[in-house]
Amino acid sequence: MYENDNDLRSEKNLISYVSDCWNVASYKLPMSYKIDYVMYRDDSPVGFAEVKVRTHTFGTFPTYIISLAKVMEARRLARETNTKSILIVSWTDRTGYLDFFSHHQIRHGGRSDRNDWQDQEPMCHFDLKHFKGIGIR
C-alpha cells in the first residue's frame, strides 16, 4: 500500500539476486496474496517469500519485527501448498532469510510515522539468530 517505485525496484533487485543464488524463478504475486513472491524450481512451486530491503546494518535492532497477520498468511500458504514460506531481508551489510515457522514473540506495536492507526497491531519479533545468510552480499 505504501510501496513506492524505489522500494519496488530494490525489492526486485534483491529477489533477482536470491533467485540466482538458489536457482529458482520468482514471480511477484498480486496484493491479494499478502506475500510478495512465489518461487519455482523446474516448474514446481518450492515456496513463498516476503522481501524487505532495510537501510540500516544487521544488528541495529535486537529483533526483526513484522506483522502477525503477515506471518499467519505466510504460514497458511506454506501449509496449504506443502512448501516453505520465508522472509528475505537485505540490510546494508548482509542479506539473510528466516523460515516463517521460526520461534518468535508477539508484542503490540508497529510504525508511528505515517499517522495511520492501522500501523499499530500485534507484531512478531524474530530473534536475529534465526536468520541464515544468502550468498556473499
Roles of regions detected by a PLM:
Residues 96-137:
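Intrinsically disordered, low-complexity terminal regions enriched in charged/polar residues
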Residues 1-31:
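Acidic-basic catalytic patches of nuclease active cores, encompassing PD-(D/E)XK
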Residues 37-39, 43-57:
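Conserved catalytic cores of phosphodiester-cleaving nucleases, focusing on short active-site segments
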Residues 31-35, 93-95:
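Short acidic/glycine-enriched loop/turn segments that link adjacent beta-strands
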Residues 28, 48-50, 86-90:
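A structural signal for short, well-ordered beta-strand segments and their strand-loop junctions
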Residues 54-73, 77:
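Mg2+/Mn2+-dependent nuclease catalytic core
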Residues 5, 61, 80, 86, ...:
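N-terminal targeting/trafficking signals and adjacent low-complexity tails
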Residues 75-104:
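Nucleic-acid nuclease catalytic cores
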